[in-house]
Amino acid sequence: MNNHVSSKPSTMKLKHTINPILLYFIHFLISLYTILTYIPFYFFSESRQEKSNRIKAKPVNSKPDSAYRSVNSLDGLASVLYPGCDTLDKVFTYAKNKFKNKRLLGTREVLNEEDEVQPNGKIFKKVILGQYNWLSYEDVFVRAFNFGNGLQMLGQKPKTNIAIFCETRAEWMIAAQACFMYNFQLVTLYATLGGPAIVHALNETEVTNIITSKELLQTKLKDIVSLVPRLRHIITVDGKPPTWSEFPKGIIVHTMAAVEALGAKASMENQPHSKPLPSDIAVIMYTSGSTGLPKGVMISHSNIIAGITGMAERIPELGEEDVYIGYLPLAHVLELSAELVCLSHGCRIGYSSPQTLADQSSKIKKGSKGDTSMLKPTLMAAVPEIMDRIYKNVMNKVSEMSSFQRNLFILAYNYKMEQISKGRNTPLCNSFVFRKVRSLLGGNIRLLLCGGAPLSATTQRFMNICFCCPVGQGYGLTESAGAGTISEVWDYNTGRVGAPLVCCEIKLKNWEEGGYFNTDKPHPRGEILIGGQIVTMGYYKNEAKTKADFFEDENGQRWLCTGDIGEFEPDGCLKIIDRKKDLVKLQAGEYVSLGKVEAALKNLPLVDNICAYANSYHSYVIGFVVPNQKELTELARKKGLKGTWEELCNSCEMENEVLKVLSEAAISASLEKFEIPVKIRLSPEPWTPETGLVTDAFKLKRKELKTHYQADIERMYGRK
């Protein structure tokens, strides 16, 4: 089989519209600056280059199927952050005692909310937000203790399930800490899940209590509570909705404040509570998986602690000066793990949302500040979809610059790329050229962590350069408590996900059908298996799937079969090159990696999203494309095509024009002829988690996309 497209990022092309004399002078200044700064940077860059090039992981023996471990954990895998802190309640107690009066959780006050009429007549809600208001470690501990005690008074028993269906906010983390303290098993549900998925999860886990928000209660839960017969108590984190008459008899609605007050009163009477064991379930995390109904992954206290131990080791100098911005779904293992890492190290966590993240975000009123401008975070996690969006938005702005500004940006970009490859910094470029781009995320970001899906080399290098910080690309699954690998901060290579964390080991298993073997040259390849304390307990009430994906070796260590295909590079870093489920055999016998096709085309300015499709009954690949509205409209103008947005997307002529652009890009990316889409369908509607066509991490839900576009599939292949 062929490898993925090359991960080496290319330089930006210079537009030859700048005065040659001026261009020569700029090049002269760059050369002079490089010479003057060579000696001071030499000693620093040598150290950085040495770290970047060093061996980061090694096989533990000489066999082809040997597991790889971080060089920092060859003698044994790490499993705890702090001695004696083997459950999450102990970790928080340790942090509370150490950072007692330090700020922990921050929320912005809503000063004003108003309706804004758009040119197309639609009404958007806009908000003006104030400063961040903070709760200290002590405040959060007391609130969590009281809330847990209040839940106990409502009948919640240790080792029984309680659900949280809520947006990312401080109350989510307070509720989670309460459950960890009182040994309640926390069932997490994405706020974007549809009704059938919510009903399935709540009934499967047999919850009697659910924690939610006023908005989600009104928009999603209200219509399905009658389908969840065991439900008795609904706790809203932000006050009661105005009417209650519609709720079935037997369901009582409480506010979080009322439950906390009940718990505070009861705690005066020294109500005892059950402490968890490391092996007890902490979270049952329902994944908004890419196939079928969501599955609940059982994650123990020891699983999560091992995972955050490994993650924390990859963030140098993590501590009280750091500020993390929380906006991804806390029901996603990446966000939950990242926040627990910060909480355990004295960092502040300021809450946000995708709609209020930046000054230009959709809910922020023009002229007021978004959350990153107010919080100025130093740490941030993101999924590739968000980074791709930032990349495309900035590049659109660059294309609108004057010729001189655009060429100056490109010169600085290419110069910095060259310097980064040598381990050097570029403080002048950072200050004068990239300062405005960096300010989009507050200006203080020192580390961006990306996970949830593969990040393209182009986007990763762009974020490195323009935001003046390393991008730690990670790899992990809900089934591995979010942990697996993270690239080191001084490793500026792209297209890889780093070496195994100190909490786990990784081996490659032969996959004959795909043609991947751990004896392959020059690099071993195969299905990625993850082993260690991070490997979770399996799927809730799904023994067959658990047996298929998990196993124990002769030493009693648990392993997870990920279904992803990887290869180890000589320095011990892992590269994701394929996925078993994404591999399709065409009618003529060729194998096509759908993920490879999508990765080659997704970063085109014309493409907002793309899903490649093929099956074994046909000899060619087709695709569904969400085009970029601005780029498609401009292409239509150039080709003399007119119509509304929907008419353009439904136009055969427009499909053919877009297909030409895709085909050229596919050839440039060295795709084989049989891998290049032959026909496409343009979608006028974006794919969001709300549509059910992508997960909350914006991974494609192939089954749902196939169903959604079934008529188009039949059209493109010809009905048989």
Swiss-Prot record:
<dbReference type="GO" id="GO:0030182">
    <property type="term" value="P:neuron differentiation"/>
</dbReference>
<keyword id="KW-0597">Phosphoprotein</keyword>
<dbReference type="Pfam" id="PF00501">
    <property type="entry name" value="AMP-binding"/>
</dbReference>
<keyword id="KW-0472">Membrane</keyword>
<dbReference type="GO" id="GO:0005524">
    <property type="term" value="F:ATP binding"/>
</dbReference>
<feature type="modified residue" description="Phosphoserine">
    <location>
        <position position="683"/>
    </location>
</feature>
<keyword id="KW-0547">Nucleotide-binding</keyword>
<keyword id="KW-0460">Magnesium</keyword>
<dbReference type="GO" id="GO:0005886">
    <property type="term" value="C:plasma membrane"/>
</dbReference>
<comment type="function">
    <text>Acyl-CoA synthetases (ACSL) activates long-chain fatty acids for both synthesis of cellular lipids, and degradation via beta-oxidation. ACSL3 is required for the incorporation of fatty acids into phosphatidylcholine, the major phospholipid located on the surface of VLDL (very low density lipoproteins). Has mainly an anabolic role in energy metabolism. Mediates hepatic lipogenesis. Preferentially uses myristate, laurate, arachidonate and eicosapentaenoate as substrates. Both isoforms exhibit the same level of activity.</text>
</comment>
<dbReference type="GO" id="GO:0031956">
    <property type="term" value="F:medium-chain fatty acid-CoA ligase activity"/>
</dbReference>
<keyword id="KW-0576">Peroxisome</keyword>
<dbReference type="GO" id="GO:0005811">
    <property type="term" value="C:lipid droplet"/>
</dbReference>
<dbReference type="GO" id="GO:0047676">
    <property type="term" value="F:arachidonate-CoA ligase activity"/>
</dbReference>
<dbReference type="InterPro" id="IPR020845">
    <property type="entry name" value="AMP-binding_CS"/>
</dbReference>
<keyword id="KW-0443">Lipid metabolism</keyword>
<keyword id="KW-1000">Mitochondrion outer membrane</keyword>
<protein>
    <recommendedName>
        <fullName>Fatty acid CoA ligase Acsl3</fullName>
        <ecNumber>6.2.1.15</ecNumber>
        <ecNumber>6.2.1.3</ecNumber>
        <ecNumber>6.2.1.2</ecNumber>
    </recommendedName>
</protein>
<comment type="similarity">
    <text>Belongs to the ATP-dependent AMP-binding enzyme family.</text>
</comment>
<keyword id="KW-0496">Mitochondrion</keyword>
<feature type="transmembrane region" description="Helical; Signal-anchor for type III membrane protein">
    <location>
        <begin position="21"/>
        <end position="41"/>
    </location>
</feature>
<feature type="topological domain" description="Cytoplasmic">
    <location>
        <begin position="42"/>
        <end position="720"/>
    </location>
</feature>
<dbReference type="GO" id="GO:0035336">
    <property type="term" value="P:long-chain fatty-acyl-CoA metabolic process"/>
</dbReference>
<dbReference type="GO" id="GO:0001676">
    <property type="term" value="P:long-chain fatty acid metabolic process"/>
</dbReference>
<keyword id="KW-0256">Endoplasmic reticulum</keyword>
<keyword id="KW-0812">Transmembrane</keyword>
<dbReference type="GO" id="GO:0005741">
    <property type="term" value="C:mitochondrial outer membrane"/>
</dbReference>
<dbReference type="GO" id="GO:0004467">
    <property type="term" value="F:long-chain fatty acid-CoA ligase activity"/>
</dbReference>
<dbReference type="GO" id="GO:0005778">
    <property type="term" value="C:peroxisomal membrane"/>
</dbReference>
<keyword id="KW-0735">Signal-anchor</keyword>
<dbReference type="GO" id="GO:0005789">
    <property type="term" value="C:endoplasmic reticulum membrane"/>
</dbReference>
<dbReference type="InterPro" id="IPR000873">
    <property type="entry name" value="AMP-dep_synth/lig_dom"/>
</dbReference>
<keyword id="KW-1133">Transmembrane helix</keyword>
<keyword id="KW-0436">Ligase</keyword>
<keyword id="KW-0492">Microsome</keyword>
<keyword id="KW-0067">ATP-binding</keyword>
<dbReference type="InterPro" id="IPR042099">
    <property type="entry name" value="ANL_N_sf"/>
</dbReference>
<keyword id="KW-0276">Fatty acid metabolism</keyword>
